[in-house]
Curated annotation (Swiss-Prot):
CDD domains: Era, KH-II_Era
Function: An essential GTPase that binds both GDP and GTP, with rapid nucleotide exchange. Plays a role in 16S rRNA processing and 30S ribosomal subunit biogenesis and possibly also in cell cycle regulation and energy metabolism.
Quaternary structure annotation from Swiss-Prot or TrEMBL: Monomer.
Entry-linked PANTHER family: GTPASE ERA, GTPASE ERA, MITOCHONDRIAL
The organism of origin for this protein: Streptococcus sanguinis (strain SK36)
Gene Ontology CC, one term: cytosol
Name this polypeptide is given: GTPase Era
Keyword Protein biosynthesis part of the UniProt annotation: no
Amino acid sequence: MTFKSGFVAILGRPNVGKSTFLNHVMGQKIAIMSDKAQTTRNKIMGIYTTDKEQIVFIDTPGIHKPKTALGDFMVEAAYSTLREVDTVLFMVPADEPRGKGDDMIIERLKAAKVPVILVVNKIDKVHPDQLLAQIDDFRQQMDFKEIVPISALQGNNVSHLIDILSENLEEGFQYFPEDQITDHPERFLVSEMIREKVLMLTREEIPHSVAVVVDSMKRDEETDKVHIRATIMVERDSQKGIIIGKGGSMLKKIGSMARRDIELMLGDKVFLETWVKVKKNWRDKKLDLADFGYNKKEY
């Protein structure tokens, strides 16, 4: 039997459902989600393998107009995938009109010599007439290889999109073992799960000002638990106070929620210790960005 494989980038503005789609395809959480824009900061690989094929999805940060060095990193990380993949899924929401951000991405896609499939997500939120108008509007902007409406949240039409990708794969290698679902180490996934809970439980400027560093992660032979020490980095003392909360209540809630997800991922009991530190203006300092896992060497 011929084995087929290929790399597929998922591009789009912030909050269009890229990570929701990837998690649905993989059948488990490998990319964190929240209602905050720019939740995804790094390129995250999801490896979908069957006995006939391997599709390596690359979930990218939402493309936006950057205001910090971290923003620059995120946008460049997203666009860099155009040099690495065989197909691009350009994801747009069905319930929002085409905007300047979409047009900016379209211009970059036109210049890239890669087939582009338009994926219109969130079809569960609109009337069919609105969906048709949205598809027609985008169809006039560039020549897409396919246009596929889906609901990543409910799973509508996702299998059809996978079938289209499979049909267009070329004969190739199995790049990763069949039981590997992502290229990121466990420490990265742990830090992201903690950051996700901060995003879920805080508001205002805090979500964009937070980074999480896993300081240590090892099994305690006496308790047979994985002992994790992690530091939540913020930019101001006031943010530190909010994350700790009255009597440590917020930090305890963040830790408790994160621990449950980490235990599910690792299949182990976990003892999680979290600390909060202030690192002023870290989002604009290249050394800090590298220390916190946002390294330009990745692209």
